[in-house]
């Protein structure tokens, strides 16, 4: 094969062109000015409970700017990506030298955001979907540990770290008590465990604690959002029943509504990824983020000099790592997948969560791992982002009959900033060490993904003067699948944008 036809050679050539393009386009990242002028307009402050709102002790960041009627709450997993932008801005003085007042305020706001999440854990035992009482029947992907890492790396405040780790332990306990399932001896066979480690032999899934009255109301909401295709399946399932708690018969349509409410906890509301069986799936991203939680507790208590606790969390994180490598990993593809807890087998749905093991730095750093990751990028990354799920027409590895016939926004062709970020950081983690060529390819792909993200954001900002919730993975435009009228956004779109703009072109 001639080098001009080789995708690898083209990517190597691209890395040279990339550095040239970064220098040439430095002046073109004009949306940074919009971010600087407007980030504070996304901050609200409601210290007291008010109607459905849960009062928070500090000002908190929301996904939208003042005046927008949607997303006025503080959302759990959104906050991680919002903080990435605040921290990038707050620690990269625009004119060199000392940070100015606004930059210092951005850093302080990031700390306020995490302190608010810690407050919610101490109040409720976990972080809810958002600071509304009506959203306390579910959480969102557990990124508190990642946020604690980000803050402590900058402040080195050990007193704050001790407080944060205490809350993180409580949150971890909640996930293990409320969102986990025991494994069979055959599933953990071969994994080294200690005398008191049997309680850790569990995998986690997304779920909810809604009662039937809430699920009935939620099903009506789904009818309006997802359309007649949802209604058809819901009504058909309601012709049958299942035996629930206390031996009571319940219509099967409620189980469908419950699965979709659990998708809301995953953050992927809604998607074909779980095939409307979310509670039956040990989600790869969830278990990877809980591994990161355990690793944060292990390393955090080591920093604080508490060796006993550190060793305990190190052991727990190693057990989870072994479980993920044993049950979620497929040696034939070299990739990690979701795990079906009802069928006790891999759930083969090609999706962007497959980059999460690399985001949390779980797999080994060797050539085999890196070449498999290169192959995954070829399959899952589009021109302007990462496919949430591949269309079934090209997902040749899928082994399921799709029962999700309604429109879903966490699917092709939508590109979501959180998934882009997880992928970029995962590739960066493995763009070093053994294997020069695959490492180089991962580095180039990471930079290409950042640049295409910036290009997409800048292109639409030039046309509209706004950031948006999601973009088209193929065109970089706003021709996306919506489950509701897409609002102009700030939140994770602006946060990821600001981090990449400052990382690639500097202050």
Predicted regions and their residues:
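Bacterial Sec-dependent N-terminal signal peptides
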Residues: 1-27
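Long, repeat-rich segments with strong aromatic
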Residues: 277-304, 409-432
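Extended, hydrophobic/aromatic-rich amphipathic alpha-helical segments that build helical scaffolds
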Residues: 79-80, 87-91, 144, 166-169, ...
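Extended, well-ordered alpha-helical scaffold segments
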Residues: 32, 95-117, 157-176, 293, ...
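Aromatic/His-enriched, Gly/Pro-containing loop or helix-boundary segments
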Residues: 120-164
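Alpha-helical support elements that line or immediately flank enzyme active sites
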Residues: 76-117, 353-365, 420-432
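Extended glycan-interaction surfaces of carbohydrate-active proteins
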Residues: 28-73, 112-131, 185-281, 322-415, ...
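Core register positions within helices of long alpha-helical scaffolds
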Residues: 85, 147, 293, 300, ...
């Amino acid at each position: 094969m001639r080098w001009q036809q080789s995708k690898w050679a083209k990517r190597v050539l691209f890395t040279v062109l990339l550095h040239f393009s970064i220098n040439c386009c430095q002046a073109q990242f004009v949306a940074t000015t919009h971010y600087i002028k407007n980030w504070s307009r996304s901050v609200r402050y409601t210290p007291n409970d008010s109607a459905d709102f849960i009062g928070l002790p500090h000002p908190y960041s929301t996904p939208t700017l003042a005046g927008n009627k949607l997303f006025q709450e503080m959302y759990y997993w959104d906050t991680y990506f919002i903080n990435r932008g605040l921290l990038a801005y707050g620690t990269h003085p625009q004119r060199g030298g000392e940070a100015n007042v606004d930059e210092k305020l951005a850093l302080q706001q990031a700390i306020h955001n995490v302190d608010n999440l810690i407050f919610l854990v101490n109040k409720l035992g976990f972080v809810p979907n958002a600071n509304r009482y009506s959203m306390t029947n579910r959480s969102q992907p557990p990124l508190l540990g990642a946020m604690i890492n980000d803050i402590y790396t900058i402040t080195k405040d050990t007193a704050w770290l001790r407080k944060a780790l205490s809350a993180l332990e409580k949150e971890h306990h909640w996930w293990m008590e409320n969102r986990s399932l025991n494994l069979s001896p055959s599933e953990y066979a071969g994994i080294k465990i200690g005398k008191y480690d049997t309680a850790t032999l569990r995998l986690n899934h997304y779920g909810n604690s809604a009662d039937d009255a809430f699920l009935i109301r939620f099903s009506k909401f789904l009818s309006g959002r997802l359309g007649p295709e949802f209604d058809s399946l819901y009504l058909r399932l309601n012709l049958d029943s299942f035996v629930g708690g206390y031996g009571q018969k319940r219509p099967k349509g409620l189980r469908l509504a419950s699965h979709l409410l659990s998708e809301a906890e995953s953050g992927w509301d809604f998607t074909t990824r779980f095939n409307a069986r979310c509670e039956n799936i040990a989600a790869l991203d969830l278990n990877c983020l809980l591994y990161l939680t355990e690793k944060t507790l292990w390393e955090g208590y080591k920093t604080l000099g508490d060796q006993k606790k550190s060793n305990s969390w190190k052991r727990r994180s190693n057990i989870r790592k072994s479980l993920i490598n044993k049950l979620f990993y497929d040696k034939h593809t070299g990739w990690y997948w979701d795990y079906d807890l009802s069928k006790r087998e891999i759930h083969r749905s090609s999706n962007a969560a497959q980059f999460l093991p690399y985001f949390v730095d779980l797999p080994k750093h060797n050539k085999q791992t890196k070449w498999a990751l290169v192959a995954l990028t070829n399959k899952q990354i589009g021109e302007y982002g990462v496919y949430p799920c591949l269309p079934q027409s090209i997902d040749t590895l899928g082994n399921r009959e799709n029962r999700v016939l309604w429109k879903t926004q966490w699917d092709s062709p939508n590109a979501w900033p959180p998934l882009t970020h997880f992928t970029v950081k995962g590739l960066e983690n493995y763009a070093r060490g053994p294997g020069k060529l695959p490492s180089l390819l991962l580095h180039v792909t990471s930079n290409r993904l950042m640049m295409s993200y910036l290009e997409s954001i800048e292109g639409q900002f030039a046309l509209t003067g706004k950031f948006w919730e999601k973009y088209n993975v193929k065109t970089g435009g706003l021709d996306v699948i919506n489950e509701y009228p897409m609002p102009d956004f700030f939140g994770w779109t602006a946060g990821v944008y600001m981090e990449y703009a400052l990382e690639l072109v500097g202050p």
